[in-house]
Design a protein with these regions (language model features):
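Bacterial N-terminal signal peptides
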Residues: 6-18
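Boundary/activation segment at the start of structured domains
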Residues: 20-103, 110, 117-119, 251-259, ...
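Active-site-proximal beta-strand/loop segments in catalytic clefts of secreted hydrolases
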Residues: 31-35, 69-72, 105-109, 122-123, ...
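Second-shell loop/turn segments in exported
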Residues: 34-42, 71-79, 92, 116-122, ...
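Active-site-proximal C-terminal subdomain of hydrolase catalytic domains
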Residues: 49, 143-233
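A short, glycine/acidic-enriched catalytic loop
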Residues: 80, 107-138
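Alpha-helical, heptad-rich or low-complexity scaffold/stalk segments
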Residues: 147, 266-319
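Caspase-like cysteine protease fold
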Residues: 194-281
């Protein structure tokens, strides 16, 4: 038995053990920083409202778990300042578990001075490294979406296996205001984004739909695209564009903003099976990332064992559904 296989045995034993069902809580933090002018302030207001409404009405987020920080033009709002961002994430950190999901969406403007990437806030800005430090303290699964110009460096700064990071640009040199946020929010709100028609809209489906819409936006105007969105979830910080080949997208394909199926059933046994299915699917994606680090025979044996167990669990789910 190889050392790699020996290390994998405890993981498989944990996977195959019965899982207790627990309810997933979904959190969202929508941050609008400095508006950059009246035109952008009105635009961000519309985006914030649409995103909040979509998360609550379409995806069933609890209103109290959807936090929006506003630009400086909103009277009486909680502004998107560094202090308020830190406070909001601190509150989530205290209650979020590894089974929960946190969506962070940045709306506004970003900068890159050749060394440091920042998201423009009301008052002092936060760097990509500072965002990573704060978010790494939160136990929940993370979907981080920076919709601004010059957002590309955030991909490298926030990279982590199993963490979904989306940026509106594929280069720090892309410094024009983006249309990606408009189409990202639109993709979230439309039923047609669920391409596989399984009743759940995955993060990958939203990314693909939004990216394609951005491409069409520029093509219809006969303009050269100044933005190309990237998605990274394998932790290499490279990312890939919509339609491109690459390892990224495995976790984003599994993750959705919809409530987990386990939360929709009153059958504890079925809920436990659904949760185990999600765990097995995620572990299969993790194993794919280890393919080059293990002897081929050991990797194949481990993968086949996972697939057999996933098939068994899926069959049990069908019987009890």
């Amino acid at each position: 038995m190889t050392r790699a296989w020996t290390a994998l045995v405890p993981m498989l034993a944990l996977l195959l053990a019965p899982h207790a069902a627990s309810a997933e809580t979904r959190f969202a933090l929508i941050v609008s920083g400095a508006s950059g002018g009246e035109k952008y302030a009105e635009q961000m207001k519309q985006w914030r409202a649409s995103l909040q409404t979509t998360l609550v009405n379409r995806y069933g987020f609890d209103e109290k778990n959807v936090r929006a920080l506003t630009d400086e033009s909103v009277a009486g709002g909680t502004t998107g300042s560094a202090a308020n961002v830190k406070a909001a994430l601190s509150e989530i950190r205290k209650i979020a578990t590894k089974d929960d999901l946190l969506l962070v969406v940045l709306l506004g403007h970003g900068t890159f001075d050749g060394e440091t990437a920042k998201f423009n806030l009301v008052g002092p800005d936060l760097t990509a490294a500072e965002w990573n430090q704060m978010l790494s303290a939160v136990a929940a699964r993370l979907v981080f979406v920076n919709t601004t110009e010059a957002s590309f460096p955030f991909l490298e700064a926030l990279k982590a296996k199993g963490r979904v990071v989306i940026t509106a640009t594929n280069s720090a040199a892309q410094k024009y205001a983006t249309v990606f946020p408009e189409y990202f929010i639109k993709a979230l709100s439309e039923a047609s984004t669920d391409l596989d028609k399984n009743g759940r809209t995955s993060i990958l489906e939203v990314f693909e739909a939004a990216s394609l819409a951005v491409k069409q936006y520029y093509e219809q105007r006969g303009q050269l695209s100044t933005e190309r969105a990237l998605i990274d979830d394998n932790g290499d910080g490279q990312g890939r564009e919509q339609g491109a080949e690459g390892a990224d997208g495995g976790f984003a394909r599994l993750w959705s903003l919809d409530a987990e199926p386990a939360a929709a059933t009153n059958n504890p046994e079925l809920a436990a099976l659904l949760k185990q299915q999600r765990t097995l699917e995620a572990q299969a994606e993790e194993l794919k990332l280890k393919k080059g680090d293990m002897p081929p025979a050991d990797w194949q044996a481990a993968y086949e064992k996972l697939m057999l167990e996933l098939a068994r669990v899926s069959q049990e789910i069908r019987k009890k559904s």
